[in-house]
């Protein structure tokens, strides 16, 4: 039997399948788009094409669009699934920072169990959407934004509100501030917000999941801000789906 996890996030929909030992045997990702129902149908189409919707396979759905997965056997909160996925990827103890499209989560794990968590889901500042908006204003991709920031000198973006921060960036552009300096200010703003949420992780292993886990410069900056080496891996983007799959498979 395989366990199948479907994580319908605000930006991307992820699918993972694991075997009885918790090893990932399939993963898939697609933009969520406008409709969670359409995202769930796209995930189902992938699973059917891959031959993974056998009757003896269990499906667990998570993420903000989890209730749109009509073929799921169970729905589980994203905090529980991200904790379970991170424990499987990195180990049972530590702090997990998940930067999503519309929220940021910090999850404390002990013996593979979520002990507490913090979530910023009221404001886009410190999220992937914030970076996306700022990159658009600078006419670059998110990866190009990080490359620019690496060679830039920090300029202060003081607002914690995305709308006001966007106005600050527009003003800096108008004043002729070098683009790389603005990019560095944007990265520093995000890292500062996330590090503030994770201030209670001192002395713990810290792991990064979500869409920023492939952004090396942000990982470096976050490691510096937290005075530790923030660890991640190529599968960390799928942590929520992997956690859901592990629950579906009954993996401890």
Can you say where each PLM-predicted feature lies in the sequence?
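Short glycine-rich, Thr/Ser-proximal phosphate-binding strand/loop in the N-terminal lobe
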Residues: 3-38, 42-45, 114-117, 121-122
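Glycine-rich phosphate-binding loops at beta-strand->alpha-helix junctions
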Residues: 64, 198-225, 236-240
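Glycine-rich phosphate-binding/hydrolytic loop that grips phosphoryl groups
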Residues: 130-132, 233-252
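Short beta-strand-loop/turn "lid" adjacent to the catalytic site in phosphate-handling enzymes
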Residues: 20, 29-32, 48-80, 115-116
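Adenine-nucleotide phosphate-binding core of ATP-dependent small-molecule kinases
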Residues: 162-202, 237
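Phosphate/pyrophosphate-binding loops at sites that engage ATP/ADP/AMP, CoA/4′-phosphopantetheine
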Residues: 44-57, 194-205
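Glycine-rich phosphate-binding loop plus the immediately following alpha-helix
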Residues: 111-157, 161
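Conserved phosphate-binding catalytic cores of ATP/NTP-utilizing and phosphoryl-transfer enzymes
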Residues: 65-116, 243-248
């Amino acid at each position: 039997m395989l366990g199948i996890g479907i994580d319908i996030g605000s930006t991307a929909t992820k699918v993972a399948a694991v075997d009885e030992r918790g090893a990932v045997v399939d993963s898939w990702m697609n933009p969520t788009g406008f409709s969670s129902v359409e995202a769930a149908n796209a995930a189902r189409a992938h699973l059917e094409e891959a031959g993974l919707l056998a009757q003896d396979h269990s499906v667990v759905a998570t993420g903000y669009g989890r209730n749109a997965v009509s073929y799921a056997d169970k729905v589980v909160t994203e905090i529980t699934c991200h904790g379970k996925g991170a424990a499987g990827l990195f180990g049972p103890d530590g702090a997990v920072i998940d930067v999503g499209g519309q929220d940021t989560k910090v999850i404390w794990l002990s013996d593979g169990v979520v002990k507490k968590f913090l979530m910023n889901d009221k404001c886009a500042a410190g999220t992937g959407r914030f970076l996306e908006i700022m990159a658009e204003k600078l006419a670059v991709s998110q990866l190009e934004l990080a490359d620019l920031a690496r060679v830039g000198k920090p300029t202060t973006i003081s607002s914690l509100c995305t709308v006001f921060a966007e106005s600050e960036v527009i003003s800096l552009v108008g004043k002729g501030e070098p683009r790389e300096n603005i990019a560095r200010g944007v990265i520093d703003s995000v890292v500062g917000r996330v590090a503030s949420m994770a201030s209670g992780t001192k002395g713990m292993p810290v792991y990064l999941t979500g869409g920023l886990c492939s952004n090396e410069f942000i990982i470096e900056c976050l490691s510096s801000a937290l005075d530790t080496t923030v660890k991640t891996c190529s599968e960390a983007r799928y942590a929520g789906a992997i956690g859901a799959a592990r629950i579906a498979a009954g993996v401890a």
